[in-house]
From Swiss-Prot:
Predominant location category: cytoplasm
Any one GO biological process: mRNA processing
Active site per the UniProt annotation: D58, E130
EC number: 3.1.26.3
Chain ranges of the RNase III domain: 18-141
The protein's assembly and partners: Homodimer.
Molecular function terms, GO-annotated: double-stranded RNA binding; metal ion binding; ribonuclease III activity; rRNA binding
Its biological purpose: Digests double-stranded RNA. Involved in the processing of primary rRNA transcript to yield the immediate precursors to the large and small rRNAs (23S and 16S). Processes some mRNAs, and tRNAs when they are encoded in the rRNA operon. Processes pre-crRNA and tracrRNA of type II CRISPR loci if present in the organism.
InterPro entries: dsRBD_dom, RNase_III, RNase_III_dom, RNase_III_sf
Protein name from the UniProt record: Ribonuclease 3
Gene that encodes it: rnc
Domain of life: Bacteria
Classification of source organism: Bacteria, Pseudomonadati, Campylobacterota, Epsilonproteobacteria, Campylobacterales
Protein family per UniProt: Belongs to the ribonuclease III family.
Keywords on record: Cytoplasm, Endonuclease, Hydrolase, Magnesium, Metal-binding, mRNA processing, Nuclease, RNA-binding, rRNA processing, rRNA-binding, tRNA processing
Organism per entry: Helicobacter pylori (strain ATCC 700392 / 26695) (Campylobacter pylori)
Length: 239
């Protein structure tokens, strides 16, 4: 979908209405302003953006996905359930779900973010997905969010189980670099920002003193996992 810049606005906005997005989501917003807020990144510097909704969405999705996994995998102990939830409730997991409904095509971002392909960044896309689900929760309640999430998980994942869903990318990368280069990756904190309840960490990954990836996450561990995933993809492409 092509996006355009309004003459009276500093941000990029989609050409079409949100009807296609709502159809893919399986929910039509009564208050379109709430939907628009959920899709508005802070880079637009508008009075309302999706940060507060993102905060609520994080809590709502943690509960919804936790309950879904609790009932679906009755044979799993707390440790396995935590791993499953962590793989979905993450920037990588929410980005995957967001792309299942082409959410990136509807984000409102600044012109500078548009130039840097910001609408494809996991940190921006996953936050918008959390905000979108918070909007659904505020209008239609928890049951509707549960129904939407069940449908999206079925669409985004061919199989929803521990073996196919959870991947420790850091461990996989370490095993690969030890085999290929006889070294292990190192991680460095580049930036830490935000209040204590809403931290964002940016990490860099190095292999033999060469930077292979940078990524952001709500914890150092999540950002490191994202870095490891990127590095694995680069090493696979280089083969």
């Amino acid at each position: 979908m092509k996006n355009k810049r309004s003459q009276n606005s500093p941000y990029i906005t989609p050409n079409s209405s949100y009807t296609t997005l709502e159809k893919a989501l399986g929910y039509s917003f009564k208050d379109k302003r709430l939907l628009e807020q959920a899709l508005t990144h802070k880079s637009c510097k508008l009075a309302l953006n999706n940060e507060r909704l993102e905060f609520l969405g994080d809590a709502v999705l943690g509960l919804v996905i936790g309950e879904l996994l609790y009932h679906k995998f009755y044979q799993y102990d707390e440790g396995k359930l935590s791993k499953l939830r962590a793989s979905i409730v993450s920037a990588h997991g929410f980005t995957k779900l967001a792309k299942a409904i082409a959410l990136q095509d509807y984000l409102r971002v600044s012109s500078s973010e548009e130039i840097s392909n910001g609408r494809e960044k996991p940190s921006i896309l996953s936050s918008a997905f959390e905000a979108l689900m918070a909007g659904v929760y505020l209008e239609a309640g928890l049951a509707k969010v549960q129904k939407i999430m069940q449908n999206l998980l079925n669409r985004a994942y061919k199989r929803l189980d521990l073996e196919h869903l959870f991947m420790d990318y850091k461990t996989a990368l370490q095993e690969l670099t030890q085999a290929q280069f006889c070294v292990i990756p190192t991680y460095q904190l580049l930036k830490e920002k935000g209040p204590d309840h809403h931290k964002e960490f940016e990490m860099a990954l190095y292999i033999q003193d060469k930077m292979y990836a940078t990524a952001k996450g709500k914890s150092k561990k999540e950002a490191e996992q994202q870095c490891a995933y990127q590095a694995l993809q680069k090493l696979k492409e280089a083969k």
